[in-house]
Amino acid sequence: MLSRYIHIFLFFSYIIPKTFVGLSMNIKLEREKLILFTKVGAIVLTSIALLSASLMIYPDTAATLSNSLVHEKELPIYCVEQDKPLISISFDAAWGNEDTPKLLEILKKHNVKATFFMTGGWIQKYPDDVKAIAAGGHDLGNHSENHKHMSPISAEECKTELMKPHEKVKELTGKDMILFRPPYGDDNDTLIKVCRETGYYPIQWDVDSLDWKDYDAATIIRRVTEHKHLGNGSIILCHNGGKHTAEALDELLTTLKQKGYQLVPISQLIMKDNYTINTEGRQVK
């Protein structure tokens, strides 16, 4: 920071003399130039010293000034500030449905409501599964029409990717989806703004099961239940088509309950209004 002050002083020491170029070079004017330059230099250095001292005394002011000069990225919801031990488990559905009935059966056994993020293609291919998910009281979530990376596309294309599956689910179930998870977790400011404009809450996750890597059931369970970010307000990511996800789910839910967690759908975990999202992606009041 000191180097910045030096540069400012050097700037004034260069500019001020230049303003006098072309003026009479008599002794009186030269003396006035010197006096003026000295006064301005003293004022500048005094101001810099006072500013530096105030920023050290009031660091919050310094942070505010810094933040006002830096563009703040729009953030989705990765987790939620929660006093109670509430968490959510979610399943991305983009390919296959072989294990979906088993997942729903296990969720019902544990009286757990989950959130399913579905692509437009999956909705169209497996309409009965969509209806079964809705009938089970689970959240119906939007996972885009074509499961493409969202950050490179325009706002209009983002809107199309959101609204096509929205209309399909509305036609099948009569329900309006309000949760959107971008494929690959790929988001940017444009997408987040489109979500808000279309009535969606952009949702990510803070606990990844990595079930899509075909880890065995024991590894999936351990990854989730021992995850460093697992805590009140966590959102767990799984996939309905994971090779061992269905095999792991029963014990996973049992272990999470033994740890004292209550599982609720994401729509019940998040705040709907009067919130902000901090730099960690945590939704807070």
Question: What do the PLM-derived regions correspond to, one by one?
Answer:
Residues 63-153, 157-168, 173, 177, ...:
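Active-site beta->alpha N-cap acidic-glycine motif
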Residues 113, 139, 201, 208, ...:
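Residue-level detector of anion-binding/catalytic polar loops
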Residues 92, 107, 143, 180, ...:
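Conserved, mostly hydrophobic/aromatic
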Residues 91, 118-119, 145, 181-185, ...:
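Active-site-proximal beta-strand/loop segments in catalytic clefts of secreted hydrolases
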Residues 2-37:
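N-terminal Lys/Arg-rich, disordered targeting/topogenic segments
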Residues 39-56:
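Hydrophobic membrane-insertion alpha-helices, especially the h-region
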Residues 97-99, 148-176, 186-232, 244-248:
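Alpha-helical scaffold elements lining the catalytic groove of polysaccharide deacetylases
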Residues 61, 69-83, 109-111, 122-124, ...:
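C-terminal domain-boundary segment and adjacent tail
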